[in-house]
Amino acid sequence: MNSFLLFFVGLVSISQLGAEELSRFKLMTFNILQGGGNAKNVGFGNELFGGSRIDEIASAIKLARADIVGIQEDCSSKSNMLLNELGDGWNRAGKVYSKFPAQLIHSNKDRSLEVVDVELAGSRVVRIVNCHWWPNNYGPFLAQEKLRADPQVDLNSLAKIVQEKGVRRGGTRGYSTTIEPLEEAIDEKRAIFLVGDFNEPSHLDWTENYARNGSDRWVNNPTGTPLRFLVRWPGSVLLENIGMVDSFRQFHTDEVKKPGNTWTPPYP
């Protein structure tokens, strides 16, 4: 699972707004895990939070001073618990919460994707694409499994296996469903931001440089073989190919000094 807990950046294509306008709002992506309910199976039981996590989730959003938040694993569409906890000044368009007026343009429930237009000050509109890709055949878990079975496995072969698993028949995560509205917005020269839980790492993190110089990605690795090798993860490659820019990597260009770690805390 590659769940974003407090990960403030997504992928962005900027065609209409300049840097000055973009600096006027803060965008956040946040997987709140199982609708903010009792997520004990992933280490977030309600008993740790006084019976409910909703107030802590709202507090985290406020602490981040976010203006727009793409939520994954949101509360039920019929429930406004989080919206109510955020308080006055917030509205909701599907799973996108905003201090600015927001309108749901498109949703695909099968692939947990929503397209939302947000109107900033001065009638400037940005498009937010919020996605949650399927977790099946999660590459790092597969790599851990292979390393446990054979710590001396050829890492180049292992990289090929985990890369191909994401795109094999029945194993895609939601790439095309996400790419389509992005390409449409880019063609229309809109300012667009992609946020989400991608359930897949980025090729900008799993580089040759990181494979040589980075730390072991596997906390308490029992195999003796560091989990670090070059992988051209297909999802992030596809996004880069259509012109999207990883905003985290744009500002933090050294993936060894600033690795893009987005693991949920209980996981290695």
Regions found by a protein language model. Give the residues of each.
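Active-site regions of metal-assisted phosphoester/phosphodiester hydrolases
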Residues: 20-59, 98-268
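Glycosyltransferases and closely related glycan-assembly transferases
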Residues: 81-87
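Proline-aspartate-enriched helix->loop->beta-strand connector
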Residues: 57-61, 65-70
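Sec/Tat signal peptide C-region and signal peptidase I cleavage site
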Residues: 14-19
